[in-house]
Swiss-Prot record:
Pfam families on file: v110 (PF01639)
Name of this chain's protein: Protein MGF 110-4L
Family: Belongs to the asfivirus MGF 110 family.
Keywords: Early protein, Glycoprotein, Signal, Virion
Motif (Prevents secretion from ER): 121-124
Induction: Expressed in the early phase of the viral replicative cycle.
Localisation per UniProt entry: Virion; Host endoplasmic reticulum-Golgi intermediate compartment
Glycosylation-annotated residues: N64
Length: 124
């Protein structure tokens, strides 16, 4: 009985103190995923803003250096990503979601590439 009481007390303390209660491997919804996971998240949805470093309207991809520089426009979306068990989710914030099996990922880049404008030196 004492063990059960202490277990419940520990769970309540975690909730009050805001400590994570999720098991290792889960990722709560965020628009700033861990740096070491950018390679994964930015491969399957490269239009997320957290994948790009922009300065003066010109953006370069943080992960894939071979990607062309682009002009900052509506191609870049404010994504939130999350992982729960083996379910990876991209929330584009406008009611559009891309959900995939984390161990069998499916890219969701094509619909967004239509809005991408590649930077040309003449654009200055």
């Amino acid at each position: 009985m004492l063990v059960i009481f202490l277990g419940i007390l520990g769970l309540l303390a975690n909730q009050v103190l805001g400590l994570p209660t999720q098991a290792e491997g889960h990722l709560r919804s965020t628009d700033n995923p861990p740096q070491e996971e950018l390679g994964y998240w930015c491969t399957y949805m490269e239009s997320c803003k957290f994948c790009w470093e922009c300065e003066h309207g010109i953006c370069k991809n943080k992960v894939n250096r071979s990607m062309p520089w682009i002009i900052e426009n509506s191609y870049l979306t404010s994504c939130e990503v999350s992982r729960w068990y083996n379910q990876c989710t991209y929330d584009e914030g406008n009611g559009h979601y891309h959900v995939m099996d984390c161990s069998n990922p499916v890219p969701h880049n094509r619909p967004h590439r239509l809005g991408r404008k590649i930077y040309e030196k003449e654009d200055l």
